[in-house]
Amino acid sequence: GPVGTGDSKCPLMVKVLDAVRGSPAVDVSVHVFKKAADETWEPFASGKTSKTGELHGLTTSEKFVEGVYKVELDTKSYWKALGISPFHEYAEVVFTANDSGHRSYTIAALLSPFSYSTTAVVSNPQE
C-alpha cells in the first residue's frame, strides 16, 4: 500500500509523552504481559520507544488474541536518566483486548515525575 499505511496492521501501539519537557519520551522500556490461565503474568512482548516516543511492531493480529494484557512502562529509569527522582517505580495499563473481535489499540501515556495518565484509543482494524 501507500507509504505510511504500514501501521494499520499493527494491533498494539504505545506512545509516551514527557509532560515536563513537552516532548516525546524517548528510549522508555516497554514490557507487555499476558495473563495466563493460572492468573500469572507471562511475558508477551517488549521494546523501547523511538525518537517520536512511539513503539510499533510489538505483535501481530495473529498473536494478539483475546485476553487480559498489561503494558508496563519503565518510567523510573527514564526520569533517573534525566537526573530526576520520580515517585512511581513504573506506569502500567491493564486491559482486556479483542473480546468482541479484533481491534487496534493505541496506549498513550503522559508522564510527570509524580503523576502519570494514560488514554486508550481503540479502533476497528483497517482492512
From Swiss-Prot:
Positions with a binding annotation for L-thyroxine: 15, 54, 117
GO cellular component: extracellular space
Alphabetized GO MF terms: hormone activity; thyroid hormone binding
Gene3D superfamilies linked to this entry: Transthyretin/hydroxyisourate hydrolase domain
Gene Ontology biological-process entries: purine nucleobase metabolic process
Assembly and oligomerization: Homotetramer. Dimer of dimers. In the homotetramer, subunits assemble around a central channel that can accommodate two ligand molecules. Interacts with RBP4.
Job of this protein: Thyroid hormone-binding protein. Probably transports thyroxine from the bloodstream to the brain.
PANTHER family for the chain: TRANSTHYRETIN, URICASE AND TRANSTHYRETIN-RELATED
Annotated protein name in UniProt: Transthyretin
Species in which this protein is naturally found: Oryctolagus cuniculus
